[in-house]
């Protein structure tokens, strides 16, 4: 979303909100799609659990540790990630977040040992760290304080939408794709649900601008 100096001037003098409405229509639906992709990558391990544990002979303890270690990586790197977002530029860093978590999430399809499971879940947390705070920070670049409450509320509406879509989609993949190309349903789940993250990550480089300045 390249911004010209004249457009920036329009935003500065926008008295009836028409320019901000245009920006909202351009940014918010796209960022909601990005959040949906983030949600799918974060929770698909829960949908994959039964098939994955059966195929790999993992115990519930192994699964629980692997599922939880995601948040360790996420918490440790959340603040550094947002510092780097500010230094590197929003579109570059958010794109990096999405592409890297997509690739790591896809690699989950080829896990064979508990150690591989732990490492990839931790790295997934590291990769995804800072995404939501980073997007919220990015939105503050485009909207004044009077607009931020409603814009952030619209973005966060992606949370229930993700819950509505994520479960049925994951169930369909597990049921319909199991055995295709010799891969189990849980493997296809990790592969299919990470493709949108990678595609959207590259789309960010074309679609977003670092700031209004």
Residue ranges and their predicted role:
Residues 57, 89, 110-116, 127, ...:
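Helix-breaking motifs and short loop linkers at transmembrane-helix boundaries and internal kinks
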Residues 2-43:
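Cytosolic juxtamembrane N-terminal segment immediately preceding the first transmembrane helix
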Residues 120-157:
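Cytoplasmic helix-loop-helix junction between adjacent transmembrane helices
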Residues 185-206:
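Symmetry-related core transmembrane helices of the 12-TM Major Facilitator Superfamily/SLC fold
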Residues 149-175, 197:
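Glycine-rich segments within core transmembrane alpha-helices of 12-TM secondary carriers
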Residues 43, 71-79, 129, 163-164:
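Residue-level signature of mid-helix packing/kink "hotspots" within the transmembrane helices
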Residues 76-115:
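Conserved MFS/SLC helix-loop-helix module at the cytosolic interface between two early adjacent transmembrane helices
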Residues 26-60, 76, 166, 170:
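Extracytoplasmic
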């Amino acid at each position: 979303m390249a911004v010209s100096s004249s457009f920036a001037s329009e935003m500065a003098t926008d008295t009836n909100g028409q320019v901000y409405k245009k920006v909202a229509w351009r940014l918010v639906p796209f960022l909601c799609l990005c959040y949906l992709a983030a949600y799918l990558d974060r929770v698909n391990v829960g949908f994959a659990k039964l098939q994955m544990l059966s195929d790999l002979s993992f115990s519930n303890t192994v699964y629980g540790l692997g599922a939880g270690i995601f948040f360790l990586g996420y918490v440790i790197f959340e603040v550094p990630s947002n510092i780097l977002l500010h230094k590197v530029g929003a579109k570059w860093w958010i794109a990096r977040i999405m592409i890297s978590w997509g690739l790591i999430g896809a690699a989950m399809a080829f896990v064979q040992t508990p150690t591989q499971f732990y490492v990839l879940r931790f790295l997934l947390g590291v990769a995804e760290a800072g995404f939501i705070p980073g997007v919220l920070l990015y939105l503050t670049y485009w909207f004044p304080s009077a607009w931020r409450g409603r814009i952030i509320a619209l973005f966060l509406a992606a949370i229930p939408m993700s819950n509505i879509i994520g479960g049925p989609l994951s169930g369909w993949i597990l049921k319909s794709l199991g055995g295709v190309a010799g891969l189990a349903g849980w493997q296809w789940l990790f592969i299919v649900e990470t493709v949108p993250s990678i595609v959207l990550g590259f789309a960010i480089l074309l679609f977003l601008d670092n700031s209004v300045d």
